[in-house]
């Protein structure tokens, strides 16, 4: 299958990173290579780029997309949470001029129904971005305690019917394990009252999102990647993060705010005793969102938020 993925907020990312001919850039979620190709084009074909992705199919697609930049690109199969060790192994720690993290599932992964990311087609309950990952959605649904399933749905999906859905999942699995996306959708439809099913899009949307985040430990990966990205940047280098979920955006916002703080000593202290210095300058006080034009072309950009900061 051809890897189809439209890069979100592309012009905004280029404006944020301001690629230059002698620059070194890192795309922590290279996907189909759309953002990476545009970054390299902006460097007049002279810049260098390190591309990471844990999905081997995405990496193969990126290799094709970036073929004309082959001499300037280093592609590594790795989760972006390991970007610190990748950069260190390549001898580039503290030398990266711009880093992009585009968090979440790609449109291509959603299109590959057999991977179980979408509630619109029947497939095994997998949801792993890395096919070698340890835990599948089926294992969570069939093996985790009811309380833990409730927590996942409530925290990661912000699903108001989390408790009922978790109860219905456990009741169903005592009779027969949940094996397919259709099994899960049927349980969700049964758990959510009929009137509530008519609200806010597909009734399974939040549950599928929550399971995907849990299976891939997306929030944990982001929390590890942000400090590693800051260390990897050169002075004045920029970090651009695109998130699609309020929890992810909150993590990015709080990290930027914390790293932008300087001395925390009381105002009446004559000399700083804490030694804390700001490491980041926030470029986007409010997240950048997609234009009306982009929303028409790429519906995925509807929930996309871009935050940018610069290393001091």
UniProtKB/Swiss-Prot annotation:
Molecular-function annotations in GO: rRNA (cytosine-N4-)-methyltransferase activity
GO BP annotations, alphabetical order: rRNA base methylation
Binding site for S-adenosyl-L-methionine: 33-35, 53, 80, 102, 109
Keyword Repeat: no
Chief location: cytoplasm
EC number: 2.1.1.199
Protein name: Ribosomal RNA small subunit methyltransferase H
């Amino acid at each position: 299958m051809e890897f189809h993925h439209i890069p979100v907020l592309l012009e905004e990312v280029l404006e944020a990173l301001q690629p230059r001919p002698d620059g070194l850039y890192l795309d922590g979620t290279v996907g189909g290579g759309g953002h990476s190709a545009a970054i390299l084009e902006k460097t007049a074909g002279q810049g260098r780029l390190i591309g990471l992705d844990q999905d081997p199919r995405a990496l193969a697609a990126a290799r094709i997309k970036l073929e004309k930049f082959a001499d300037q690109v280093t592609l590594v199969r790795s989760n972006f949470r390991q970007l610190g060790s990748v950069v260190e192994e390549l001898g580039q720690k503290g030398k990266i001029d711009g880093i992009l993290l585009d968090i979440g599932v790609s449109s291509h992964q959603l299109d590959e129904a057999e991977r179980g990311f979408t509630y619109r087609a029947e497939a095994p309950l997998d949801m792993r971005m890395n096919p070698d990952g340890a835990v599948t959605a089926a294992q969570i649904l069939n093996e985790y305690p009811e309380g833990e399933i409730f927590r996942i749905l409530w925290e990661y999906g912000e699903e108001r019917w989390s408790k009922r859905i978790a109860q219905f999942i456990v009741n169903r699995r005592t009779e027969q394990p949940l094996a397919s996306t259709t099994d899960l959708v049927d349980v969700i439809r049964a758990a959510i009252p009929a009137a509530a099913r008519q609200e806010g899009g597909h009734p399974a949307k939040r549950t599928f999102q929550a399971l995907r985040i849990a299976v891939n430990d997306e929030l944990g990966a982001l929390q590890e990647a942000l400090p590693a990205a800051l260390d990897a940047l050169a002075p004045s280098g920029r970090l651009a993060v695109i998130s699609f979920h309020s929890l992810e955006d909150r993590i990015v916002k709080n990290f930027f705010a914390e790293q932008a703080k300087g001395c925390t000593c009381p105002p009446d202290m004559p000399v700083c005793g804490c030694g804390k210095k700001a490491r980041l300058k926030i470029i986007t006080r409010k997240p950048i969102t997609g234009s009306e034009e982009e929303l028409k072309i790429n519906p995925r950009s509807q929930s996309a938020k871009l935050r940018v900061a610069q290393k001091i």
